[in-house]
Amino acid sequence: MSRIQNTFAALAAQGRKGLIPFITAGDPDPSRTVELMHALAEGGADVIELGVPFSDPMADGPVIQRSSERALAKGVTLRRVLDDVRRFRERDRQTPVVLMGYANPIERMGEDAFAAAARDAGVDGVLVVDYPPEESHDFAAKMRAAGIDPIFLLAPTSTDDRIAAVGEVASGYVYYVSLKGVTGAANLDVSTIEGKIPAIKSRVPLPVGVGFGIRDAATARAVAEVADAVVIGSRLVQLLEQAAPENAAAELKEFVAGLRAAIDGAAKPAA
């Protein structure tokens, strides 16, 4: 099994839910990315989503857009992100790392070259926002051949056909976008999420992580009551945007530890 599959199997065996925090590689300072990744793991992250900066992040709200702009302005590239993962792996061989981003940087490197470089760096999963599952069979096969889980998005508007298409290509887990719109939006409706997850699981036999709209321990716990994992990004990126550089890792670890405690208080099994 992959590191991601092992992680979710262990969580299920313990009756626990996953915590998947997101930060943008290179923000606020490229020299601190690995330190921040360790802070996430030490705070209780089960999987780390590491954003690959891109100039046109269409699915992201203003907070993550700004973080991408800052990272790009400091020269962060896909190869630099892979190097960050490689350096993270020098100390942490257990926590899965998922790269989340857009197709252009991967296509510029070449899918085969990317698969090999990501494997060698210690990447466990890849979520390419603008790769529709119906057109991603070759890409997903290349990732799986390299031991990397291809991860896909589903949304409240996803049809049964789209869910089935994700089921054909995805592995690791599915990222369910709980809201229409972009990352960082508000008005989370947990009852709607709870109603959608059985439809997803009937066609996609994978854990479901839920993100978008999760801002604090209370919303994280509410989502953990109905999902297999909680994904949180914009709030963490905002924290890093506002923190003094010398305090960023400690503040991030403390915030994530609060989420971990709240999620561990969620006892209801996922649908």
From Swiss-Prot:
Classification via InterPro entries: Aldolase_TIM, RibuloseP-bd_barrel, Trp_synthase_alpha_AS, Trp_synthase_suA
Catalytic activity: (1S,2R)-1-C-(indol-3-yl)glycerol 3-phosphate + L-serine = D-glyceraldehyde 3-phosphate + L-tryptophan + H2O
Keyword flag Lyase: yes
Cysteines joined through disulfide linkages: none
Enzyme class: lyase
A cellular component term, taken from the record's GO annotations: cytosol
Coiled-coil zones: none
Cross-referenced SUPFAM superfamilies: Ribulose-phoshate binding barrel
Pathway: Amino-acid biosynthesis; L-tryptophan biosynthesis; L-tryptophan from chorismate: step 5/5
EC number(s) from the headed UniProt entry: 4.2.1.20
Record: active site: 49, 60
Oxidoreductase listed as a keyword: no
Gene3D superfamilies named in the record: Aldolase class I (3.20.20.70)
PROSITE patterns registered for this protein in UniProt: TRP_SYNTHASE_ALPHA
One Pfam family of this chain: Trp_syntA
This protein's UniProt keywords: Amino-acid biosynthesis, Aromatic amino acid biosynthesis, Lyase, Tryptophan biosynthesis
NCBIfam families the record matches: trpA
Protein family: Belongs to the TrpA family.
Described purpose of this protein according to its UniProt entry: The alpha subunit is responsible for the aldol cleavage of indoleglycerol phosphate to indole and glyceraldehyde 3-phosphate.
Assembly information from the UniProt record: Tetramer of two alpha and two beta chains.
Annotated protein name in UniProt: Tryptophan synthase alpha chain
Organism listed in the record: Burkholderia thailandensis (strain ATCC 700388 / DSM 13276 / CCUG 48851 / CIP 106301 / E264)
